């Protein structure tokens, strides 16, 4: 096998999750569950990939959310790879953003720029329901008794 163009397309975790889910549904509907060695390997890879992706933020995304996110990212002047990492991982702290965006100190001269990027990411991309519940519980604990 030969790779013609390594960067012809970048896929987000959401796109891979949707593609594999659709393929799985199509195979189930058609009743074609081939049992060749190659097909078994493909089924295993599909299962393991879906199992992993179902535990990531992509599970709660939609085409509209991805479109809105990419539109909002235009003002931040990020590379395609950086946007993809932010979309796939949904960072929740400035440190996580600094790990995903190269040369953050030079490109974002003010702390407010990183905070604005973080706000955009956390505002548009849905959080895991468990994470949102933990965050609201921690916020209530910090407020203390009234």
Curated annotation (Swiss-Prot):
One Gene Ontology term, aspect cellular component: DNA polymerase III complex
Subcellular location as annotated: Nucleus; Cell membrane
Protein keywords: Cell membrane, DNA-directed RNA polymerase, Membrane, Nucleus, Transcription
GO-annotated molecular function: DNA-directed RNA polymerase activity; nucleotide binding
Gene3D superfamilies, A to Z: 1.20.1250.40
Pfam families: RNA_pol_Rpb4 (PF03874)
Membrane topology: Peripheral membrane protein
Keyword check for Nucleus: yes
Described purpose of this protein according to its UniProt entry: DNA-dependent RNA polymerase catalyzes the transcription of DNA into RNA using the four ribonucleoside triphosphates as substrates. Specific peripheric component of RNA polymerase III (Pol III) which synthesizes small non-coding RNAs including 5S rRNA, snRNAs, tRNAs and miRNAs from at least 500 distinct genomic loci. With POLR3H/RPC8 forms a mobile stalk that protrudes from Pol III core and functions primarily in transcription initiation. Pol III plays a key role in sensing and limiting infection by intracellular bacteria and DNA viruses.
Subunit field text: Component of the RNA polymerase III complex consisting of 17 subunits: a ten-subunit horseshoe-shaped catalytic core composed of POLR3A/RPC1, POLR3B/RPC2, POLR1C/RPAC1, POLR1D/RPAC2, POLR3K/RPC10, POLR2E/RPABC1, POLR2F/RPABC2, POLR2H/RPABC3, POLR2K/RPABC4 and POLR2L/RPABC5; a mobile stalk composed of two subunits POLR3H/RPC8 and CRCP/RPC9, protruding from the core and functioning primarily in transcription initiation; and additional subunits homologous to general transcription factors of the RNA polymerase II machinery, POLR3C/RPC3-POLR3F/RPC6-POLR3G/RPC7 heterotrimer required for transcription initiation and POLR3D/RPC4-POLR3E/RPC5 heterodimer involved in both transcription initiation and termination.
Protein name, entry field: DNA-directed RNA polymerase III subunit RPC9
The organism's taxonomic lineage, starting at the top: Eukaryota, Metazoa, Chordata, Craniata, Vertebrata
